[in-house]
A protein has these predicted regions:
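Structured, active/binding-site neighborhoods that engage oxygen-rich ligands
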Residues: 1-266
């Protein structure tokens, strides 16, 4: 989960086409690096999943509550228009989105459950709170599933094959092939596959983040998704863990510590 948060922070200065930097030789962290809505919602979903105790209806309500609470606590984190309206709606119904927000916030689901089937079920619940379009659900499930597979010892070829066979994403592309024509887009179907490819082509945790940002596009969300996967596969260097936590406010750090305690108890 902390890898996803760092990915968000690393990608934040390069979001949107006019800020994209399509090379890997950028400062990993700078004065412009900051957490965004991706981090806020990652923390919110983690707390909601813990409160939900693996029960679908309870989890739906808990995730909905936490997302609205944290979203209002951080009103200027960078939410989209539809999501912002949902945060303040009297009746917060899902609105059929297939945006990549469902995938950016789901990292904790890849860690909190003991089976792939349960991981997929809970990822679906977290998406359906807002992103109940099939592509929105698929993006969240694919992200959580890859995190689960990465942390449970599966190889990159195994992960690639699973994604292709289960979700139908095209994994037979390279970062060099994607980069020239890739632009800012916020759909799951045009962000999640690219984020997974950035991980598959990497040689380390940091290299995965650099791959993701170098593609361009919705760089903070892309790197957030990639970072969550890369942490599960490679681990995360202690100095980067420390630097990430230093850049977070106390309540988000507390949400992370609650998550870490829960995965330590399993």
């Amino acid at each position: 989960m902390l890898g996803a948060i760092l990915g968000d922070i690393v990608g934040s200065p390069y979001e949107f086409d006019h800020n994209n930097y399509k090379h890997k030789d950028f400062p990993l962290l700078s004065e412009k690096s900051h957490f965004t809505d991706d981090t806020v919602m990652t923390a919110a979903v983690a707390v909601g999943l813990i409160d939900g105790k693996g029960l679908p209806e309870r989890t739906f309500c808990a995730v909905q509550h936490e997302m609205r609470f944290w979203g209002r606590e951080y009103p200027h984190a960078g939410y989209g228009g539809m999501f912002r309206r949902w945060l303040h709606a009297e009746n917060p119904n899902p609105y059929g989105s297939f945006g990549d927000g469902s995938a950016m916030r789901v990292a904790a689901a890849g860690w909190l459950f003991d089976t792939l089937d349960k991981t997929l079920e809970m990822a679906k619940v977290t998406a359906e709170v807002t992103h109940n379009h099939p592509e929105g659900i698929k993006g969240a499930q694919a992200t959580a599933a890859v995190i689960f597979l990465a942390r449970t010892g599966h190889s990159k070829p195994e992960i690639k094959q699973y994604v292709e066979q289960t979700f139908g994403y095209d994994m037979n592309r390279t970062c060099d092939e994607i980069r020239p024509t890739y632009h800012h887009v916020e759909t799951c179907q045009e962000t999640v596959p690219e984020a997974i490819i950035a991980f598959l082509e990497s040689v380390s945790f940091e290299d995965a983040l650099r791959n993701a940002v170098s593609l361009g596009g919705d760089s903070d969300t892309l790197a957030c998704i990639t970072g969550g996967i890369a942490e599960a596969f490679y681990g995360m260097p202690q100095e980067l863990q420390d630097e990430t936590l230093k850049r977070l406010p106390e309540d988000i750090r507390e949400g992370y510590e609650l998550f870490r305690w829960n995965i330590g108890q399993r």
